[in-house]
Amino acid sequence: MKDNVIPAFRRGYRMQWEAAQDSHVVLYPEGMAKLNETAVAILELVDGKQDVAAIVATLDARFPDAGGVGDDVKEFLQSAIEQKWIQCREPE
């Protein structure tokens, strides 16, 4: 995954707090997926404006003791693409 691509939720997909699940979830037309704290930290930055490098930089600053989260963030985003939650576009 290139650092300059910009991830965004696909149409019909969104992340929200679901009180019944007592957690954040990704809602999509066929159902929902319960998210862990790491997934929430990443997906809350997926806004269709920030590129992958900016998301990684924000999380590196937020979690300095993690020793660099870039590979993990990219791996998660790739998984979210495969799950069809998000899509990435090239910068304009």
From Swiss-Prot:
This protein's record includes keyword Cytoplasm: no
InterPro entries in UniProt: PQQD, PqqD_bac, PqqD_sf
Name of the featured protein: PqqA binding protein
Subunit-level organization: Monomer. Interacts with PqqE.
NCBIfam families cross-referenced by the UniProt entry: PQQ_PqqD (TIGR03859), PRK02079.1 (NF002535)
Name of the gene: pqqD
Family assignment from sequence similarity: Belongs to the PqqD family.
Coiled coil, from the record: none
UniProt function note: Functions as a PqqA binding protein and presents PqqA to PqqE, in the pyrroloquinoline quinone (PQQ) biosynthetic pathway.
Pathway: Cofactor biosynthesis; pyrroloquinoline quinone biosynthesis
GO BP term, example: pyrroloquinoline quinone biosynthetic process
Keywords attached to this entry: PQQ biosynthesis
GO molecular function: quinone binding
